[in-house]
């Protein structure tokens, strides 16, 4: 029954999950041909859809030409318990793997995650990192029991509908990454300071506000035909913003800037500490 529900429902995938999988694949050991990990998610009560919102990588060992796979279960349990301390609403909903097709070890992994999932029917996210056709293909499966009654039975992995979903913070980050990728003359990997990004976003917001004011003035002057859809959208946008005076807005803006500067300082300190730690670890033994 759960499998039938998933086959008909829409699954939403957060960009953070893909970025985590790509990072894990780039950092994999040299003797590993793929990476696998646990998918975490939650049910969205507003939309009624299931969201894949997080994941973590598993330590494992593959055996070529065999369906055997060894997984560090203690590490998996520890990672899940640590994640529950911060995000208790995220539960295990399946696993992910990199590759062009479903591996021979998928059945064994399905049996393990069937015990870990609340509904007993985990999902399998397959990411093709070979970039065939300059695209990273992703497919989501659910296992359906097939076979003859009172006879031999097996599993068939059926495709599930999956869509990318992102909120406002994720959209800002994705737009920035896309903007940097479309500028080949820019230094690769270089990200502008946060304050410069705030200035750019503020400038874009001012441009959009000027466009809205021009539309409203032209409509009031009867130079443009009124559009009820646009009017309702503007009304919803304006009523969603609380009405505050200039002094209160200035104080809130300054407080947010101070918080951002503190975050930048802490992030810089952590980055410097990580670089020092990597340098110390890479030093040869004396």
Curated annotation (Swiss-Prot):
Family as reported in the entry's similarity comment: Belongs to the eIF-3 subunit F family.
InterPro entries: eIF3f, EIF3F/CSN6-like_C, JAMM/MPN+_dom, MPN
Species of the source: Drosophila willistoni (Fruit fly)
Chief subcellular location: cytoplasm
Keywords: Cytoplasm, Initiation factor, Protein biosynthesis
Top-level taxon of origin: Eukaryota
Name of the molecule in the record: Eukaryotic translation initiation factor 3 subunit F-2
Presence of keyword Cytoplasm: yes
